[in-house]
Amino acid sequence: MKRMKNIRLGTLVACMCVLWGCEKPNVNIVMPQEASNRVLFAGEHLKKALEDAGYSSVMLSDTAGIDKDEVCIRLEQATDTAGLKKEGFTISTRGNMTTVTGNDGSGVIYGCRELIDHVGQYKDLKFPAQLTDAPEMVLRGGCVGIQKMEYLPGRGVYEYPYTPESFPWFYDKEQWIKYLDMLVENRMNSLYLWNGHPFASLVKLEE
């Protein structure tokens, strides 16, 4: 009986050690105190993605007080952008320190998206030792059609008022935020709203 208790106790201790070892580390996200809105946006999205993946995360303005064994992600913009492509970024990792250097604010966002995609795909923080990337196309975006598929009563071709009654989804702020976040996830930087021109109702031609 005593031996059985010892076995159970040993098993419990072993399980606790395994669970302790599997605990996900805290991730420090460091960015300049005077960071631009885009860098702040990048940091906030990275923080949320890490927390959704089970990591604890904190945003800091410097590395003071951070232990060398702690995971740290530094976000910064390049000071010398000569010869660098717009919206590009470089990711470099040395030990527990990963640095995302954007050629501009958008580059920092896309660099953070690269880290977010890595966490989602590989379920770890083993980021690339060195990675440089930049968009090939200047404009990348989605197109949203703002039109009806039928004539409105008493109106001609493409005649429809953009009111909450006619286009309720157009005034749904929460939905637009989700859509814009989707554009960011897909590295898009522009949004196109398309509508038909009511030419037929504006120009009257003789029979």
Feature-to-residue mapping (PLM):
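Bacterial Sec-dependent N-terminal signal peptides
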Residues: 1-25
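A structural signal for alpha-helix termini and helix-coil/disorder junctions
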Residues: 3, 52, 56, 118-121
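Acidic, contiguous N-terminal accessory segments
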Residues: 8, 22-95, 126-129
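A broad detector of short, well-ordered amphipathic alpha-helices
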Residues: 12, 40-41, 109
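Generic recognition of cysteine residues
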Residues: 15-17, 22, 72, 112, ...
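Feature activates predominantly on carbohydrate-active enzymes
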Residues: 34, 45, 49, 81-82, ...
